[in-house]
UniProtKB/Swiss-Prot annotation:
This is Signal peptidase complex subunit 3. Belongs to the SPCS3 family. Glycans are attached at N125. The keyword Membrane applies. InterPro entries: SPC3. Residues 1-12 are cytoplasmic. It is found in: Endoplasmic reticulum membrane. It comes from Kluyveromyces lactis (strain ATCC 8585 / CBS 2359 / DSM 70799 / NBRC 1267 / NRRL Y-1140 / WM37). Essential component of the signal peptidase complex (SPC) which catalyzes the cleavage of N-terminal signal sequences from nascent proteins as they are translocated into the lumen of the endoplasmic reticulum. Essential for the SPC catalytic activity, possibly by stabilizing and positioning the active center of the complex close to the lumenal surface. Essential for viability. GO terms for cellular component: signal peptidase complex. Keywords: Endoplasmic reticulum, Glycoprotein, Membrane, Signal-anchor, Transmembrane, Transmembrane helix. It is a single-pass type II membrane protein. The chain crosses the membrane at residues 13-35.
C-alpha cells in the first residue's frame, strides 16, 4: 500500500495540475474575448496639445547654471472609452499618455516619455473626457533639448487581469506636434 505521505503528494500534485489548467483556460478565454471585442483597435482622441517650455538649471533635470536644459509642461484634451477592455477577468486598467520622438545624438533611436497616467479600477470609471488637463510629468531630455523636433503623443493601456499575463496596447488616435523653443531671459538682457 501507499503511505500517507505518498497519497498526500499524489493528491496535491493532481490538485496543482488541475489548478494550472483552469488558470490557463481562464487566461485564454479572457484574451479571446478581448480579441472578439476588437479592443486592439480602440479609438481615442488627443487634441489641443499645448506646452509651456522653460530652461531649467536644476540638477534633477540634468541641467546646470552653465548648461540649462529645456523642460516642458504639457496641457491637453483627451476623449476615450475603455469600457470594452473590462471583462470578467479584468482587475484594473492602467492608461497612460506618452510623447515619442527621435533622439538628436542617434536619430534612429526612439525615445518615449510618459506625461500622464491613470488607474481605472472598474468599467463604471472607464469613459473619460478630459479637457485642458495638465500633464502629471514634465517633458525633458538627457540631451538637454526637447524642442524643435516632432513629438507624437499616444494613449496606451495595460490590462491587469485576475489570472494570466498583462495585456497591453495603444489606441489608434495619435497627435504629432513640435514644441516651440523657449526664450532665454538672460540672453535677452
Amino acid at each position: 500500500m501507499f503511505s500517507l505521505n505518498q497519497r498526500f503528494q499524489h493528491v496535491s500534485s493532481l490538485a496543482l495540475s488541475c489548478s494550472f489548467l483552469v488558470i490557463a483556460l481562464i487566461a485564454a478565454t479572457s484574451w479571446l474575448q478581448l480579441v472578439k471585442d476588437n479592443v486592439f483597435e480602440l479609438e481615442s482622441q488627443l487634441s489641443h496639445i499645448r506646452s509651456a517650455t522653460r530652461f531649467a538649471k536644476q540638477k534633477r533635470y540634468g541641467g546646470s547654471a552653465v548648461n540649462p536644459t529645456e523642460v516642458s509642461k504639457i496641457r491637453f484634451n483627451a476623449d476615450f472609452d475603455f469600457s470594452r477592455l473590462f471583462n470578467w477577468n479584468t482587475k484594473q486598467v492602467f492608461a497612460y499618455v506618452t510623447a515619442e520622438y527621435e533622439g538628436d545624438e542617434n536619430p534612429h533611436t526612439m525615445n518615449e516619455i510618459t506625461i500622464w497616467d491613470k488607474i481605472i479600477p472598474s468599467r463604471d470609471n472607464a469613459t473619460f473626457t478630459l479637457s485642458d488637463i495638465d500633464a502629471k510629468y514634465q517633458l525633458w531630455d538627457l540631451e538637454s533639448k526637447i524642442t524643435e523636433r516632432p513629438l507624437t503623443f499616444k494613449l496606451h493601456w495595460n490590462i491587469q487581469p485576475w489570472f494570466g499575463f498583462l495585456i497591453n496596447g495603444e489606441t489608434t488616435g495619435s497627435k504629432t506636434i513640435e514644441l516651440k523653443k523657449p526664450v532665454d531671459k538672460q540672453k535677452g538682457k
